[in-house]
Amino acid sequence: MDWRLIIGEGNVYWNMALDEAILLLREEDKIENTLRLYVFNPSGVTFGYFQKIFESINIDFLKKNNIGFTRRITGGGAVYHDANGEITYSIIADIKFFPIDIVESFRKICSGLIETIKMFGLNAEFKPINDIIVNGRKVSGSAQTRKRKTLLQHGTLMYNTNLDILARSLIVSKEKLIAHGVKTIYERVTTISRELGYKVSKENVIETMVKGFEKALKINLYRDNLSKEEEELAKKLLSKYMSKEWIYRR
């Protein structure tokens, strides 16, 4: 089965607008199933649709350091997207391709990341509902939304994320850390480079992610460009993701 592969980068607002644009156009059968691999440049923070902003992210720190932030249309928690240490993936595809059960659909899509991590010589495991763990620490998290015919799942793969900035950008309650059996965020999360003991490159990670998703999902990815309609719709949605009404709605 052939899927489109879109590789690119953009700021936090553009990336979220583009994911929604692709979702809406896939729902109308105007585009094919798509895997998008992208970088947040400059670095940014996204947080879940249902989250309360003042309980999720450190707004003062983000503003002082010119780190953009916005709310996602998907659930899940707050994420720091490092321009030099994290690749985000999004899968927008026919909902029939995935199990109806939410956990099993997460498991199927995350298998692409698990294959990727294995190709670096590390053991990874899926931890429901949406985490991937390496040596007991989180290296990836994902979030999902569904329309009638289409599923969107996007998530992270931290390969060299600055964990100090991550820790300062997000608000993680002591209760949540305790629930995971750790005291600090440094014990809770990790990166591929940290686990390997040497730095891996962005290009290597992207190339390996392509192979990992092809193997796990049994698909053939072909490189493609955004259509004019995708770009135009994303531009229209951009104002939504930049608006205070959307960002501060909860």
Model-derived features with residue positions:
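Fold-independent oxyanion-binding glycine-rich loops
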Residues: G8-G10, Y49-F50, A83, S142, ...
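Glycine/serine-rich anion-binding loops at beta->alpha junctions
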Residues: N66-I87
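Active-site loop/lid in soluble adenylation, ligation, and acyl-transfer enzymes
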Residues: M1-D60, K64, R72, K176, ...
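Catalytic beta-strand/loop module used to bind and position nucleotide/cofactor moieties
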Residues: I59, V79, E86-K215, K236-R250
